[in-house]
Amino acid sequence: METHILFFILAGLLIAVLIGYSIWSARREKSRIFSNTFSTRPPSSPISNEITADIPTTLNPQGVVAQQPFNTETPADFIQSQQEVENSVKNIRISLQTQEISQPLYQETMPESPSEAYQQNQIQEQTVQVEQVETIEQTTEHNIITLYVVAPEGVQFQGNAIVQNLEMLGFHFGEYQIFHRHLDNPASPVLFSVANMMQPGVFDLARMEQFSTVGLVFFMHLPSVGNDLANLKLMIRTVESFAQSVGGFVLDEQHQIFNDESRQNYLLRVAN
């Protein structure tokens, strides 16, 4: 009889221990889940999709008095160089004949009150100003014809050779520290000009012995003095002669080899 009582007591204690352990385990698991809901670990850095690359040293302006370091350009570098040249050409201002911009006509309406009339006048003035700015920007962008002469890969044009060949072709060093081809003498109007492809785009005649560059840009503003078509033909012949003298290549505005098809496209632009 005592054995059965002892057995029931032990069984009851064992059951109580199991129940207590189960309750304790459940609370511990619940506490662990809630404690991990918010992680204190710092967020990982996002992966950037941007590709960064150092700008080649040959494309950075080093100043006209210092010799530019030699560096072999890749196609991407060359395109970036052309963009810098185009920006430089746009910044070179040559006196041209300007045409008066016609303003659009507006229908007169009877305003209901003086305040409405004032507001309409302000809107019309702002519209005219915006249209004038857009027209001037478009005219400036499309009225510059450019050709490039670039050196072969791994080669640079030397300063003395550049000056000698440009002077033989009738260029004169002048305004903006670049070379110009004039209608007659240096006092006559400019037909077209040539600048350095590398920033800042100018030449220093006092340091031409130390000067070198990967290319030059020839450009002509339209309308030009006299006959635009004749001036463009002269510019094309001059550029091709210069390229042949210095051993370079002629490229068009799309940075492609200037061929017969490119020549016809250039002439059609002026003829139209």
UniProtKB/Swiss-Prot annotation:
It holds the Pfam family ZipA_C. Residues 1-4 are periplasmic. The keyword Transmembrane helix applies. GO terms for biological process: division septum assembly; FtsZ-dependent cytokinesis. It is a single-pass type I membrane protein. The keyword Transcription does not apply. Signal peptide: none annotated. Essential cell division protein that stabilizes the FtsZ protofilaments by cross-linking them and that serves as a cytoplasmic membrane anchor for the Z ring. Also required for the recruitment to the septal ring of downstream cell division proteins. This is Cell division protein ZipA. The lineage of its organism: Bacteria, Pseudomonadati, Pseudomonadota, Gammaproteobacteria, Pasteurellales. The gene is zipA.
